């Protein structure tokens, strides 16, 4: 076989060279020579893109129209400004030995509104699921260089691309569901695959972010009937049009490159996924997952959680408009000091994090006070826990209070339950409260009793404690205790809800998944965890808190809760109707109103910030962040524990009749909380 003539450096034969010369026309490449656009592709890829575009136009399998071709992995798509490309936006992207075909404008011309992704969305989604080496090179380093001349400007390859381009005009866009498909063509095997593309709300070309405003923050509770008695959802998870592959996929997954089934789990059919969001010089991993009885259900639940995480990390649906000091805003804004601040020692050890000052200008977003029934400005960092700029995050919030639902009322209910749950857990842990123990065998739910028995089969006793402190809302602390006292000793969880059965099941779900894994994780990470047990200052991250309690030597810090063996009380007795229980309605609006009344009646406000992503709204979902200033916030990292400095930590147990006096510093648990 005679090798092709490569003297021109293109890897193409004479006939192909002629076709390219005949068909080539000037095209608008993503990289411009005058420097006004994004950085250009390396010359080798720029030439390859021009040649492929020319062959596509000349291909008998195509339509004869001009097609823009661009390279991926040659510039930072997550930071560059949009390039007005009009109808010549790239419909073919090349990278490695692959070609991505699409996305395409809708036939009715509705391309830049209504949630139809553009080629820039594809480039951004593609980059977001690449490996760290490539992302660091594009986003932090000096970029990438071509390893050689791409050999793909040959007719039999471009004919395949052209056929896919032509085929899209015959497809019914509705057949793909809520999101359109792009096609991945392997240029070595010609194998083609379809991948769903979710629009990027932050896309500078077609993103649907809207300016934040007090009008947009207005919030009115409306009827939200539950889909069945005993549920606290307006519809079951199965009713959402939720294509998992659109969110967890290796090409352009909106929530990461894939979802993993934990086939080794001995309790639930757990799944886990992860996406990475840049925070300065490092990529922050954000995990999401589901813990149901089947992997299919766990995948769907996990995607919903992943969307909730993405919505709460930074303002993707709305763009903040207010930057001012608290002193300038006055009572139009929430004073973040009511939510707790770090000690001076933290800021001395972390000088990059600038402490809050009333005179310092910060970014604010609009929320809505359900108590005062008015819009209220809230510090961005209290709502979006990965807001840009580490130095601006005078506190590092978490997803506490962030929740999703099929209606705003559903989302508010679950967000408020989470805030109440974390507050009660921290009060009990740091206040070393003696809590009534619940008999799980008195549960009316056979699934609860069966899971407790399953944990016992694997060597764990599941124990549950009534953790109601201030509010008439059932909160249950769940603990899985390894019965032989070995590594993987303790595993904690919690649940809250107006239905005590649901609250107990929520805590059980957490420990059922984690308990069967904590032994192996604690053994693998034993050296680091033992260093934490000896010096709590080394407890730095979220996972450190639960994992360190996998060590037997940490069990003594939970003896206030687990060391005594009183009677286990039946649920019917503990949760009998009365002053410490709220009635349950068939409508979530009524449930929310009763809960808000209980919280505001105790002297607190309830603030709601709408975090809903455009793609969530397209699916009929809503996400909110619920903030109750004055309740204890959950923090991760021993130096960050705001709860220990807040007035409520000293007064709440006494006010609830659980302590004879207010707590002093030496009354508090000296060990980090074990909340997962």
How does the language model describe each region?
Residues 2-4, 20-26, 73-78, 82, ...:
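Helix-biased "structured C-terminal domain" signature
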Residues 105-116, 169-179, 389-390:
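Intrinsically disordered, low-complexity coil segments
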Residues 116-120, 124-127, 159, 163, ...:
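Residues on a specific face of well-ordered alpha-helices
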Residues 40-43, 47, 446, 590:
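Alpha-helix boundary/N-cap detector
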Residues 2, 21-31, 42-159:
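E1/E1-like adenylate-forming module used to activate ubiquitin-like modifiers
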């Amino acid at each position: 076989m005679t090798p092709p003539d490569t003297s021109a450096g293109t890897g193409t034969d004479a006939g192909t060279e002629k076709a390219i010369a005949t068909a080539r026309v000037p095209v608008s490449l993503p990289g411009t020579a005058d420097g006004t656009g994004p950085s250009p592709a390396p010359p080798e890829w720029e030439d390859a893109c021009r040649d492929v575009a020319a062959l596509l136009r000349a291909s008998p399998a195509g339509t004869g129209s001009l097609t823009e071709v661009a390279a991926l992995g040659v510039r930072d798509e997550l930071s560059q400004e949009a390039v007005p490309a009009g109808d010549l936006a790239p419909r073919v992207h090349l990278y490695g030995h692959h070609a991505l075909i699409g996305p395409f404008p809708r036939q009715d011309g509705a391309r830049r509104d209504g949630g139809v992704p553009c080629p820039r969305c594809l480039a951004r989604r593609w980059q977001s699921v690449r490996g760290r080496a490539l992302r660091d090179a594009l986003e932090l380093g000096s970029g990438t260089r071509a390893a050689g001349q791409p050999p793909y400007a040959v007719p039999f390859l471009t004919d395949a691309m052209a056929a896919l381009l032509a085929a899209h005009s015959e497809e019914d866009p509705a057949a793909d569901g809520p999101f359109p498909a792009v096609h991945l063509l392997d240029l070595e095997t010609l194998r083609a695959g379809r991948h769903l593309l979710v629009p990027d709300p932050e896309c500078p070309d077609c993103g649907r972010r809207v300016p934040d405003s007090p009008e947009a923050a207005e919030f009115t509770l409306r009827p939200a009937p539950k889909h069945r008695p005993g549920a606290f959802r307006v519809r079951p998870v199965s009713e959402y049009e939720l294509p998992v592959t659109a969110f967890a996929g290796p090409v352009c997954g909106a929530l990461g490159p894939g979802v993993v089934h934990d086939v080794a789990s001995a309790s639930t059919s757990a799944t886990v996924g992860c996406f990475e969001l840049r925070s300065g010089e490092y990529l922050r991993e954000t995990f999401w997952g589901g813990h149901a009885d089947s992997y299919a259900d766990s995948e769907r639940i996990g995607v919903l959680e992943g969307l909730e995480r993405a919505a709460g990390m930074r303002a993707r649906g709305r763009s903040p408009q207010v930057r001012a000091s608290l002193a300038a805003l006055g009572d139009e804004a929430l004073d973040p000091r009511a939510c707790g601040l770090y000690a001076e020692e933290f800021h001395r050890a972390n000088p990059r994090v600038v402490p809050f000052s009333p005179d310092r200008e910060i970014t604010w977003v609009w929320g809505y006070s359900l108590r005062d029934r008015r819009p209220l400005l809230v510090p961005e960092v209290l709502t979006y826990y990965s807001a840009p700029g580490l130095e601006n995050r005078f506190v590092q919030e978490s997803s506490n209070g962030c929740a999703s639902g099929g209606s705003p009322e559903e989302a508010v209910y679950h967000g408020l339950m989470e805030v109440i749950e974390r507050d009660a857990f921290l009060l009990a842990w740091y206040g070393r409260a003696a809590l009534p123990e619940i008999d799980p065998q008195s549960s009316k739910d056979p699934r609860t009793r069966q899971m407790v028995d399953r944990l016992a089969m694997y060597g764990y006793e599941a124990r549950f404690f009534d953790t109601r402190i201030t509010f008439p809302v059932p909160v249950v602390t769940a603990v899985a205790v390894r019965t032989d006292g070995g590594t993987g000793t303790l595993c904690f969880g919690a649940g809250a809800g107006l239905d005590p059965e649901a609250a107990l099941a929520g805590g059980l779900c957490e420990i059922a998944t984690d308990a069967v894994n904590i032994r192996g994780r604690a053994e693998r990470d034993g050296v680091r965890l033992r260093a934490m047990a000896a010096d709590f200052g080394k407890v730095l991250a979220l996972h450190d808190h639960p994992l360190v309690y996998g060590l037997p030597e940490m069990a003594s810090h939970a003896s206030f809760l687990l060391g005594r063996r009183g009677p286990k009380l039946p649920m019917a007795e503990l949760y009998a109707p009365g002053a410490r229980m709220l009635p349950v309605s068939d409508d979530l609006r009524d449930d929310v109103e009763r809960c808000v009344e209980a919280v505001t009646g105790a002297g607190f406000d309830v603030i709601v910030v709408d975090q809903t992503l455009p793609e969530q709204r397209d699916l009929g979902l809503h996400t909110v962040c619920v903030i109750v200033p004055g309740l204890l916030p959950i923090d991760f990292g021993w130096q960050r524990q705001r709860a220990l400095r807040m007035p409520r930590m000293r007064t709440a147990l006494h006010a609830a009749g659980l302590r004879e006096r207010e707590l002093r510093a030496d009354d508090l648990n000296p060990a980090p909380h074990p909340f997962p």
